[in-house]
């Protein structure tokens, strides 16, 4: 089953059109990078794809159901931009925050050994086991984003949607963060990433969708850098700086 499918999708804020006739599909196990200039509609498209907004026209299906119905919302892990104060809004420890990912599965029952193992495994997989008892508010931006990924893993999410998750994160932590995403994707997790850094996307994503109100390209990174889609979408001689290892 296709994870995400958008057909002839259009959306605007009042009289200002943001997306026009966007169609794309995301298959299980894909790593899709959404790129485009500032104000191109990347974040809006991501929010539409996972059902946080409803389109003005067109359709979006998430795991086969209308995305806005959120019928499979527990299968989606969403990591938004980390902003000042995010940690203060979560006055809990890392382990407690990750444990929240199990709540939808325990509305009618108590946490058991399987839940505890799922939380511990998720924390271990994202490399923050040594921070399990630390308050989220005391973490760095990159560490907080790992907590959100761990929460999605604890929830056994099938799709991880991220909106520029490393804004304000130092270069070394950024590199480690994207290596983590690559590893999780190799394990079978579907990833959709909004990112302004074209070099990061071409180095890590298996597919690229380039948009600026409309979709200019959807395909593999190698083909993307050889087409005119970059210049057409950005309206300038934009260069891709590789961040490969």
Language-model-detected regions and their locations in the chain:
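ABC ATPase C-loop
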Residues: 152-153
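H-loop (His-switch) and adjacent beta-strand-loop-beta switch element
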Residues: 206-221
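Conserved ABC ATPase "signature" region
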Residues: 95, 99, 113-131
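Catalytic Walker B motif of ABC-type/P-loop ATPase nucleotide-binding domains
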Residues: 160-164
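Conserved structural motif at the start of ABC-family nucleotide-binding domains
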Residues: 4, 18-19
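H-loop/switch region of ABC-family ATPase nucleotide-binding domains
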Residues: 195-196
